[in-house]
């Protein structure tokens, strides 16, 4: 296969190609508390031993190259190299293995998700000796996570800002996502917020198009926010999408949102990039703005089981880069998401300390120390009949977001919002009274619909709507 390198200058320079495993496969290595640990699912090409493949991953994502080079003798590769310290076969899969790799902390720039990913996944995924490669999980040691600011505010600060406790927050993505004028867009925002939602949202691809320029949208949305707040006595928000073609333009939009008095802005963190996202997160913390994160493009990276990167890794990276909310699937809606796997990365977003649990896809114990948590957002193909399951699955520290499930109500946007708010309040009350949402959920919704005509109408419209497909990314 490919190479390796001498690790000590004293051994002298010997030109040529060596097996990677001679230097980078170290099964006796004792991992350090400061190492970044990675779990890769790898499928070697036929004839490539798994030890050689794992060592190649460690080498090509750290100090190695395809041949021995003279300048190896000018540094200490034993100090800086990545090490494949364990390999295990994947149960039920032919020629698939989990390779565990440890990276010394000094390989990475402090506070830079961009640099971390450039090193760990930047080049090795195109390596010919591997048929497929997927990064399943990372362990971020406190020594590295403490170099990141993390979420601008976090869950508790957001609740204090909104003065809303003891229940999930309710949101709605304005539809149709493209084509509305700024004034009609603002009207839809007002109707949804007046009806009882906490948030409305720009869709991920609403930026600044000819039919609705960003400044016009921001102005009409701000008017809707203040009017709905005055009428309901509740603090309201709309995720104003600041994503733009340049970082400078993105910051200009965030600044204008703050000047209007908006409480929250939004960013598409994968299409916008981690450098832009971290810059925006710093601005939001300094200026009191909450930051909603959309994961547009994630399925290009994470949906295939054998190649790419699992969303739990992208979720950890987002927590480090900065965001107060991030979309996390629904389990029950139209988007991909198996329950145990989803709850695994939801805990990685919210909790301070998460134990290793392979049944939920968590390969390493993760200690975030004091880094604030991120609210998971359940969005995509959900409606009032899903409310009991969503409340039971995601708990209070979440945002439940109904787009079509609000704006598709037969009586209009405000009644759609009323239906969702009534359904949520009924589920929270039933849970607090000790009722089993998983078993009694439909009964709880039916009981609430008897005194809410808006909910009754919603129940009738969506009584047969289900998204029953097999999940691709399973454990």
From Swiss-Prot:
Entry's localization field: Plastid, Chloroplast
Active-site residues from the entry: 175 (proton acceptor), 294 (proton acceptor)
Modified sites of kind N6,N6,N6-trimethyllysine: 14
Residue numbers carrying N-acetylproline: 3
Enzyme class: lyase
Modification(s) after translation: The disulfide bond which can form in the large chain dimeric partners within the hexadecamer appears to be associated with oxidative stress and protein turnover.
Gene3D superfamilies, per database record: Ribulose bisphosphate carboxylase, large subunit, C-terminal domain, RuBisCO large subunit, N-terminal domain
Presence of keyword Oxidoreductase: yes
GO molecular function, one term: magnesium ion binding
Cofactor(s) in the UniProt record: Mg(2+)
N6-carboxylysine, modified sites: 201
Matching NCBIfam families: PRK04208.1
Note: The basic functional RuBisCO is composed of a large chain homodimer in a 'head-to-tail' conformation. In form I RuBisCO this homodimer is arranged in a barrel-like tetramer with the small subunits forming a tetrameric 'cap' on each end of the 'barrel'.
Role according to the record: RuBisCO catalyzes two reactions: the carboxylation of D-ribulose 1,5-bisphosphate, the primary event in carbon dioxide fixation, as well as the oxidative fragmentation of the pentose substrate in the photorespiration process. Both reactions occur simultaneously and in competition at the same active site.
Stated name of the protein: Ribulose bisphosphate carboxylase large chain
